[in-house]
Design a protein with these regions (language model features):
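Interfacial juxtamembrane loops and adjacent helix segments
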Residues: 70-133
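Helix-to-loop transition at the C-terminal end of transmembrane segments
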Residues: 38-55, 69, 91-98
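Short helix- or helix-capping micro-motifs
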Residues: 32-33, 161-166, 173, 193
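Transmembrane-helix signature of polytopic, membrane-embedded enzymes
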Residues: 25-28, 97-113, 145-167
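Membrane-interfacial, low-structure loops and terminal tails that flank and connect transmembrane helices
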Residues: 1-23
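Transmembrane-helix motifs of polytopic, lipid-linked glycan transferases
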Residues: 132-152, 187-194
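Short acidic/glycine- and proline-prone juxtamembrane loop motifs at membrane-interface regions
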Residues: 51, 176-183
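Alpha-helical transmembrane segments of multi-pass integral membrane proteins
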Residues: 29-32, 130-134, 161, 180
Length: 197
């Protein structure tokens, strides 16, 4: 031991100082966000669509194609519009025969089923593209959480917050989907962080 510090303690002191430096912070943030993007892209590719996703995707396509927002009107349209944009741009088969805007109707589920029937096995890559389009919502949420925690409690707290955001199982499970959960969390963090200024 030299001056009361072991080799390991000196290493951690050195590593912590480098990690909390401006350059170390930027590299750490980028690395964590790239890791999360990779985890989400992998999960979005290998997991089958949930029961809700066909309805979300067809509602988003309806928003782009017709400028109408009756389908899935119980949630804000931004996440499904982002998810549907690459699918709508690439082109897909749609069947709007069961569309209705009658009070209390939830036609998005029937139309989602028709979407699956019309596209068959070709619908799987479409869901993957739609999910990939929503990955930036989680990355933005992680970045905003890092910034907010860093402003409130210091650089170390910002990195710990981003680390938790990157690997938190519930977030990873929902951020791979095109549902509005992760987008809501991310914009909620942004709004709360902006409110505190």
């Amino acid at each position: 031991m030299l001056c009361g510090l072991s080799q390991i303690e000196r290493f951690w002191h050195w590593a912590g100082a480098r990690l909390l430096s401006a350059g170390g912070q930027m590299v750490s943030v980028l690395l964590l966000l790239v890791i999360q993007a990779g985890l989400l892209a992998y999960s979005a590719t290998c997991h089958s669509p949930t029961h809700l996703e066909p309805a979300f995707l067809t509602a988003g396509i309806c928003h782009w194609e017709f400028g109408r927002f009756e389908l899935y009107r119980v949630n804000p349209p931004l996440p499904r519009m982002v998810a549907a944009l690459p699918v709508w741009t690439l082109g897909c088969k749609t069947d709007w025969r069961r569309f209705t805007d009658a009070p209390g109707s939830r036609a998005e589920y029937a139309i989602g089923e028709d979407f699956l029937n019309a596209n068959g096995p070709a619908s799987i890559p479409l869901f993957i593209y739609a999910r990939w389009a929503c990955i930036p919502f989680s990355l933005l949420g992680g970045y905003f959480a890092y910034r907010w925690a860093g402003e409130l409690y210091g650089k170390g707290a910002g990195l710990v917050t981003l680390f938790v955001w990157t690997f938190e199982p519930n977030l990873l499970a929902h951020a791979e989907l095109m549902t509005p959960d992760c987008a809501s969390w991310s914009f909620g963090i942004l709004a709360e962080g902006m409110r505190g200024r």
